[in-house]
């Protein structure tokens, strides 16, 4: 028995040594939660599927505070992230849940979120057979009466045995607008886009089909140099709404004809995104 116990002890020590070597190969778990004035931010991870890992950044805002979408509207700062310092991570992409329009207090409107928002991330591993650590630097802005920039550094060890937050990430991904073709018969949908050349500057007239009377539409240019205004809505019969948007905010010297615009239509809990070219005059 004593010999068996001794052997068991040596085997246990050997197992611990091997386990220790494996754990030493993994970076220590760093902070997954950070706080800034008006918000707290959490980095979470879900399931690992081959080289793909679901993750997310959740921003939980204090009452009366807001943060911004990828296109902030008339004012604001869009979120940005970097993953330098990550280990065994080849790439990270972010998805954007459907936003809302808010008054910015200065006569304009901003686009973003109140309460809480979880940005789904898709993480690509360089080698799925090796330990991985996700390091995220997240720059964003939070606003109450005034806006302030914020930055948090978050990290976590990606664990194939984890995934307890998979349901939260999946629920957030379900709120990301789905791609849809122009003129689709589904609801919601963007039915048509026309150019009104009688107006100065020219304006886009966009007809959409929606079920919610508070349905809203947002327009983005092909790159960050475009600063398009927010479309204004007129309700029409049979669940159709018309949005009008001056073709303003186009970069100097750029002919907008044919440029791809991204239209995001938010219809209550449903949202779609449609890419359309600017019509020719």
Segments predicted by a language model, with ranges:
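N-terminal secretory signal peptides that target proteins for export/translocation
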Residues: 1-8
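Intrinsic disorder/low-complexity segments
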Residues: 5, 14-16, 186
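Bacterial N-terminal signal peptides
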Residues: 11-24
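Extracellular/lumen-exposed scaffold segments
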Residues: 29-281
């Amino acid at each position: 028995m004593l010999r068996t116990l001794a052997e068991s002890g040596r085997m246990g020590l050997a197992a611990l040594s091997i386990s220790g070597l494996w754990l030493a190969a993994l970076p220590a778990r760093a902070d997954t939660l950070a706080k800034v004035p008006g918000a707290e931010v959490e980095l979470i991870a879900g399931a690992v599927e081959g080289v793909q890992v679901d993750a997310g950044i959740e921003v939980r805002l204090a009452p009366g505070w807001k943060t911004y979408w990828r296109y902030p509207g008339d004012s604001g700062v869009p979120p940005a992230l970097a993953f330098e310092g990550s280990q065994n991570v080849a790439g990270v992409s972010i998805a954007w849940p459907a936003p809302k329009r808010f008054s910015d207090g200065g006569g304009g409107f901003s686009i973003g979120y109140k309460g809480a928002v979880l940005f789904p991330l898709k993480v690509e591993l360089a080698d799925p057979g090796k330990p991985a650590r996700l390091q995220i630097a997240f720059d964003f802005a939070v606003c109450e009466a005034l806006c302030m920039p914020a930055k948090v550094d978050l990290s976590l060890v990606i664990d194939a045995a984890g995934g307890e937050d998979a349901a939260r990430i999946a629920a957030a991904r379900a709120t990301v607008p789905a791609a849809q073709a122009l003129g689709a018969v589904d609801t919601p949908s963007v039915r048509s886009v026309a150019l009104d050349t009688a107006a100065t500057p020219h304006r886009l007239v966009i007809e959409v089909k929606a079920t919610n009377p508070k349905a809203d539409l947002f327009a983005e240019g092909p790159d960050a140099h475009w600063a398009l205004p927010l479309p204004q809505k007129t309700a029409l019969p049979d669940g159709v709404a018309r949005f009008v948007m001056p073709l303003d905010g186009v970069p100097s010297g750029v002919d907008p004809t044919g440029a791809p615009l991204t239209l995001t239509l938010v219809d209550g809990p449903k949202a779609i995104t449609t890419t359309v070219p600017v019509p020719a005059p």
